[in-house]
Amino acid sequence: MSLFPPIEPHATGMLGVPGAELFWETSGNPRGIPALYLHGGPGAGLLSGHRRRFCPETFRIVAFDQRGAGRSLPRADESAELLATCDFRTFVRDIEALRVHLGVDAWLLHGVSFGASLALAYATSHPHRVLGVVGMALSTTRASDVDWMTEGVGKLFPEAWAELSEAAPRPPGTRLVEAYRALLASPDPNVRERAARSWVAWEEAHVSLGGKGGDPRFADPRFRATFATLVCHVFAELGEAFPMGDLARVSHLPTVLVHGRLDVSSPVGVPFEVARRWGPRCELQVVEDEGHGGPKMVDACARAIARLASTHLLEPRLTGPASP
């Protein structure tokens, strides 16, 4: 299917939560099925393409910049106090605060990469507030998955990984992501900038298979500082926080996971394990010739979202007024 035409938000705002202000937007049909888009990274922030995956006549499309990212305040690279709060529990609380603020009873979740992981964390914490899940390029914060993404996959990109590793000298036994977290917290802005450059260069290398282009925002010093700081903090901090053991709580929810066979940063074994633990209501769709994202995967997500809406399993349920 073709994506829907571009649309603009009909409402935006800032939501005050403990320690942060979150930028949010709504678009589509104010009386439609509530749907929440969760961006990746962590720290990638919102663009606008996510709106085109939802029928604007069917869905009330909600999105927000997660704490520390995008237009939310303060930025993670500018506030150690904010950064210290960036964990799954707080991310989930932020989502729940937004749901209450917008008067949504329950919503469809669509998350990409880290956003897909966050969608599962929210769903297992608040299963009665979720209508279904569509995840793309799921990556988790399990220590084993983070170590693969930051070290193991270096066997496939030895040149890029050597540059990443050599830019962060560390004692034996120190995880690379821990070394980068320390560099990105340095009081020296030159040290922080070099570390951010090295990190985003590695990000572009390990997601390059399958024709996925680099993120042009990495050319922006502010963006790469925020992105690298959040990624390294979350990846170093959360460890086994991904709720793999809690998936039985959401086995009743219709779920589609779309993943690229060529995704070497988060191999297809990750969503395969999730789908097996989830049960028969979780469908894994593998796109054979794409990696950590791509147009076919985006199209598959749009189709999955439309299919869930057409099953009549998703009904708009509002606890308050439809606007903003």
Task: Label every PLM stretch briefly.
Residues E290-A302:
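Catalytic histidine-centered segment of alpha/beta-hydrolase-like enzymes
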Residues A20-A76, E81:
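Conserved HGGG/HGGXW glycine-rich cap/lid loop of the alpha/beta-hydrolase fold
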Residues R89-W107:
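Conserved acidic catalytic loop of the alpha/beta-hydrolase fold
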Residues D105-D147:
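Conserved hydrolase catalytic core segment
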Residues V264-V270:
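Conserved alpha/beta-hydrolase "acid-adjacent" motif
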